[in-house]
Amino acid sequence: MLRKLLTLILFIALNSYSHSVKDGDMDGSWRAIEGFINGEAQEVVDGLMVASEGYMSVNWTGADGNKYFNYSSYEVDSGMVNIEILNHSLDQYIGAKFSHKPNFMGDKKSYITTFVWDDVEYTHRWEKMSCSYEKCARISDFNN
């Protein structure tokens, strides 16, 4: 009985705390669940991302109401995701590079990430699309 209880506690603990990114963790279909720009919650959060084998495509509605997309290459290195934008709905961003450090839940089905772009801080919580029909661990460290 005690062994089962300890096993259950260990299982819950491993799936309740965050983990850094490793190769293959970004692969899959994702949707943005929460979004903040400079700490301000965004009303429209509809980002969709598909990532596989070092490439990703992201579509979203901007704060201005316009639809945007980008196609990027990415590389996972020492807990960081390094991104280079290969195509973007705004030409001036093609070729831009940035990095972010995803903070994953133990089941690797949701993560929070923050990055700064043009002196603006963006924070998003992403979940795998499969979380709409299966139970996934959730993480939120937002102050609301």
Q: Model regions: which residues?
A:
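Sec-dependent N-terminal signal peptides
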Residues: 4-13
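Lipid interaction determinants
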Residues: 17-69, 82-144
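Short, structured beta-strand-loop surface elements
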Residues: 74
